[in-house]
Amino acid sequence: MFVTAAYAQSSTTEGAEAHDAAAAGEVHTETGVAHEADHGAGVFPPFDTTHFASQLLWLAITFGLFYLLMSKVIIPRIGGILETRHDRIAQDLDEASRLKGEADAAIAAYEQELAGARAKGHSIADTAREAAKAKAKADRDGVEAGLAKKIAAAEARIADIKSKALADVGAIAEETATAVVKQLIGGTVTKAEIAAAFKASAGN
């Protein structure tokens, strides 16, 4: 409706201008002077006040269409893009937070397992050390017991050998004494007398 009214107004204005121009042309034809020479150079159309109404109308229509385009298409699309990016960033942050939590939990579990392994290693080392000490003590006790038995057996054998040697020495001494007496006095002496003499000398 506005376009029709403006167009009608513009047509009426242009018709009036044409009529005036024709009348002026007739006058100027009669006087022999050009129309443009009387009024000067023509006005730049955008600055012509006779076209302000239609220009304002088209400006309002253009602004309205641009506003509708911005509000219905461009701004919602930009808002959707921004919202999508915001959601994606939020999801990435949530994923990063979740991964960080999992990494922290894994590190804590690893440190706990490492501490348990160290404690177990120390316990095994202590147990092995105590077992080695016990085994060494048992081996040492066994060796000492064996040595004690061997020493006792050796001492018994030495005592037996010593007693036998002493017995042999006594017999040899008796035989030697008998031979010496026989050589000295020319008589014979019995073993009993020699033994009695040895016992008497041993008692003194």
Swiss-Prot record:
UniProt cross-references to CDD domains, sorted A to Z: ATP-synt_Fo_b
Residues passing through the membrane, by range: 56-76
Tree of life domain: Bacteria
One Pfam family cited in the UniProt record for this chain: ATP-synt_B
Topological relation to the membrane, as annotated: Single-pass membrane protein
Chain segments carrying region Disordered: 8-28
Annotated GO CC locations: plasma membrane; proton-transporting ATP synthase complex
Principal location class: membrane
Protein family: Belongs to the ATPase B chain family.
Biological function: F(1)F(0) ATP synthase produces ATP from ADP in the presence of a proton or sodium gradient. F-type ATPases consist of two structural domains, F(1) containing the extramembraneous catalytic core and F(0) containing the membrane proton channel, linked together by a central stalk and a peripheral stalk. During catalysis, ATP synthesis in the catalytic domain of F(1) is coupled via a rotary mechanism of the central stalk subunits to proton translocation. Component of the F(0) channel, it forms part of the peripheral stalk, linking F(1) to F(0). The b'-subunit is a diverged and duplicated form of b found in plants and photosynthetic bacteria.
Oligomeric and partner information: F-type ATPases have 2 components, F(1) - the catalytic core - and F(0) - the membrane proton channel. F(1) has five subunits: alpha(3), beta(3), gamma(1), delta(1), epsilon(1). F(0) has three main subunits: a(1), b(2) and c(10-14). The alpha and beta chains form an alternating ring which encloses part of the gamma chain. F(1) is attached to F(0) by a central stalk formed by the gamma and epsilon chains, while a peripheral stalk is formed by the delta and b chains.
Protein name as catalogued: ATP synthase subunit b 2
Origin species: Rhizobium meliloti (strain 1021) (Ensifer meliloti)
